[in-house]
Amino acid sequence: MNIKAYAKINISLDVIGKREDGYHLLKMIMQNIDLYDIVQVEKIPNGIKLKCNKPYVPTDERNLAYKAAKLFKETYDIKSGIYINIEKNIPVSAGLAGGSTDAAAVLKIMNKMFNINVPQSELMDLGLKLGADVPYCICGGTALCEGIGEKVTKLKPFTDKILVVVKPPFGVSTKEVYKAFDLSKVIFHPKTNELISNIEKNNIDFIANNMKNLLENVTLGRYKIISTIKEEINTCGALGSMMSGSGPTVFGFFDDILKAQKCYEKMKEKYVDVFITRTI
């Protein structure tokens, strides 16, 4: 059994507090894009085996999809072994939830495959044990995510918006970015409620001009290339550009497919991981 595991971007990312255990309290708008891994899960006699088409992706317990299979097996007392194959297209350590979306796919497939059929809400609770983005990845679409990511509220779908996505040639540790984040230095927070009402109105201009990610405060300071990519995308005629998640990936919204195509071609001359895609 296989499914597409979609990447996400953040239309906004606000940090509103910090828990005693060190986790940051977030308020963010998440959006799936038409860039995906293909995750296949099959039954085998015993154990967990994972294969991936990209050699730099770990195939042991360091992989979130492996952890998802192990957690599901333990939670629902599954005796069968599991074989996972990941055809990886989403860049890793990119701020696109590549690991989380694969883990979510494994949970969804195993839920059906073994006829456990727990409701989506229970699967999301399980996913939270793996990572803050996993509950959203189980749910997908356009959503407001709050708490540490566990509270997911579906929003009106913001589909078919053209975007160019560029990942610089390095990864960023989400943990390190949050560790360096200083909430006391934040002056302007994202206009989350206004963004939501303009998503409902399908107002791409407002979204592109007002989207905001507070983690840029950390990552842009460390990597000047991210600001450069944002400027390059804007120069190509984007309505607006922003870093996704903890970075380093940057995306720009376009209202013209030809401008987006030209931007894609221009960025492809300098960077390996460049995609032209749509919101779904």
UniProtKB/Swiss-Prot annotation:
Keywords: ATP-binding, Isoprene biosynthesis, Kinase, Nucleotide-binding, Transferase. GO terms for molecular function: 4-(cytidine 5'-diphospho)-2-C-methyl-D-erythritol kinase activity; ATP binding. Pfam families: GHMP_kinases_C, GHMP_kinases_N. The keyword Transmembrane helix does not apply. Its EC number is 2.7.1.148. One of its GO terms (biological process) is terpenoid biosynthetic process. It catalyses: 4-CDP-2-C-methyl-D-erythritol + ATP = 4-CDP-2-C-methyl-D-erythritol 2-phosphate + ADP + H(+). The keyword Lyase does not apply. Pathway: Isoprenoid biosynthesis; isopentenyl diphosphate biosynthesis via DXP pathway; isopentenyl diphosphate from 1-deoxy-D-xylulose 5-phosphate: step 3/6. ATP binds at residues 91-101. The active site is at residues 8, 133. NCBIfam families: ispE. HAMAP family: IspE. PANTHER family: 4-DIPHOSPHOCYTIDYL-2-C-METHYL-D-ERYTHRITOL KINASE, CHLOROPLASTIC. This is 4-diphosphocytidyl-2-C-methyl-D-erythritol kinase. The gene is ispE.
